[in-house]
């Protein structure tokens, strides 16, 4: 069974360590999304892998036993979770889950959304603002750049009230606003 306090690995490293095409594509993702290391990409890949395997499992259950209540409940749970995070549209099917990409997962990270909303000048600065406690979601300080933001929480992302960036006259905030304009 194992010791319950032991942390388990949240990602799986690539089978081929020095595959040139994979390294180049990961480098582009790391630069685009301001990631600290490749492990963050592998973690997002693992999240995607879990959702896709769940979708394949539901499709297999549907083809073998039909539309049983257990199958319907599992499908609704899986689709509902992905819709809540904005990875699927409101009229999505199981096939849409299989077509998701790593970029879709990375787009829902707090770091990316802070940059896309114009609260930071770059993805790296967005990461710094989050880790230093300048960003809040619905008034609650969040200091995890990899936090998956749901659709409901997205509108509540702003500077933390008591942060130095919470003041409109802050010099760095003025530079961020000028760059956005």
From Swiss-Prot:
Q: What positions does the domain S4 RNA-binding occupy?
A: 108-180
Q: Spell out the Pfam families in the cross-references.
A: S4
Q: Which UniProt keywords apply?
A: Ribonucleoprotein, Ribosomal protein, RNA-binding, rRNA-binding
Q: Does the keyword Thylakoid apply?
A: no
Source domain of life: Archaea
Listed under GO cellular component are: small ribosomal subunit
> One biological-process term from Gene Ontology?
translation
Q: Name one GO molecular function term.
A: structural constituent of ribosome
Entry-linked SMART domains: Ribosomal_S4 (SM01390), S4 (SM00363)
PANTHER family, sorted:
30S 40S RIBOSOMAL PROTEIN, 40S RIBOSOMAL PROTEIN S9
> Hey, which family's this protein in?
Belongs to the universal ribosomal protein uS4 family.
Provide the function of this protein.
Answer: One of the primary rRNA binding proteins, it binds directly to 16S rRNA where it nucleates assembly of the body of the 30S subunit. With S5 and S12 plays an important role in translational accuracy.
Q: Which NCBIfam families match?
A: PRK04051.1, uS4_arch
Q: What is this protein called?
A: Small ribosomal subunit protein uS4
